[in-house]
């Protein structure tokens, strides 16, 4: 079992996101230095993203990862701020290759433009052997299925299903989107925000941010492997596949 702090960034970020004025990082850095911090990216504090990652990587020298929170609503203004922050991070990460690429970037772009998986055996991650526990000791297969998210009655109802399928959205806008095959659709969030697992919560929440993630992840991949390719070295197949995906993304910026 791993133990690590949930910290969203520098002190200003945690105050905005969670109303936390105390700085808890020193406690975790002292007793669990190897596990690092994990954060959630919210639109209200996105302008601190680059500064937060640089602070953890350089000043604290403490592992830090962050990803966009499920169900957070991103409007055009917030998405534009995200693009600016990711642009700064792209240049920073290329200049500092020793630092790991945070999860706010999409690591596998090779499936962009592919047909959406239509597999009845394709389950969400909540059914892949994971487990979370509420304070009353009750076990759930995923934190998004807990009463804190759905309320007690609905949570029990959903968890009594044999398995919760990840279904590709039936929304017209989603069916024609070339990013559908890699869209971070979560059936639990779909139920919470759209009332059914086969209508996309992403469409009404994180869609604008996800498209910015795609664009800037493609940009980072191109920057990262530009010199590698120019040297004429043998290029691994996964790099070629992702370069192809990156090229398609950057030529379909409107998605």
Over which residues does each language-model region extend?
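Long, K/E/R/D-enriched contiguous segments that form extended
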Residues: 50-120
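Short loop/turn segments at secondary-structure transitions that flank enzyme active sites
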Residues: 9-11, 43, 70-72, 139, ...
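Short, acidic, Ser/Thr-enriched surface-loop or helix-capping motifs
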Residues: 134
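Radical SAM enzyme core and accessory elements
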Residues: 172-255
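Short, small/polar residue-rich loop motifs at catalytic or cofactor-binding pockets
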Residues: 124-128
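C-terminal accessory region of radical SAM enzymes
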Residues: 84-115, 138-185, 189, 193, ...
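Radical SAM/AdoMet-radical enzyme domain recognition
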Residues: 1-76
């Amino acid at each position: 079992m791993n133990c690590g702090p949930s910290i969203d960034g520098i002190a200003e970020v945690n105050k905005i996101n969670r109303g936390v004025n105390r700085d808890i990082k020193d406690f975790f850095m002292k007793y669990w230095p190897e596990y690092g911090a994990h954060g959630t990216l919210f639109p209200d504090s996105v302008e601190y993203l680059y500064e937060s990652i640089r602070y953890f990587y350089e000043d604290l020298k403490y592992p830090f990862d962050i990803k966009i929170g499920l169900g957070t609503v991103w409007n055009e203004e917030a998405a534009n701020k995200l693009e600016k922050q990711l642009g700064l991070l792209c240049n920073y990460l290329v200049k500092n290759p020793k630092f790991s690429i945070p999860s706010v970037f999409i690591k596998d772009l090779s499936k962009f433009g592919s047909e959406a998986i239509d597999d009845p055996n394709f389950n969400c991650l909540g059914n892949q052997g994971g487990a979370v526990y509420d304070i009353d000791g009750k076990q759930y297969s995923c934190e998004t299925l807990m009463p804190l998210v759905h309320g007690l009655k609905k949570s029990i109802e959903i968890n009594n299903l044999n398995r919760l399928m990840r279904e590709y959205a039936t929304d017209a806008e989603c069916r024609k989107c070339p990013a559908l095959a890699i869209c971070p659709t979560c059936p639990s969030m779909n139920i919470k925000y759209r009332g059914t697992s086969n209508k996309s919560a992403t469409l009404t929440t994180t869609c604008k941010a996800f498209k910015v993630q795609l664009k800037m992840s493609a940009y980072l991949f191109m920057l990262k492997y530009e010199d590698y390719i120019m040297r004429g070295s043998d290029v691994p197949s996964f790099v070629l596949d992702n370069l192809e995906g990156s090229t398609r993304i950057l030529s379909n910026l409107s998605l």
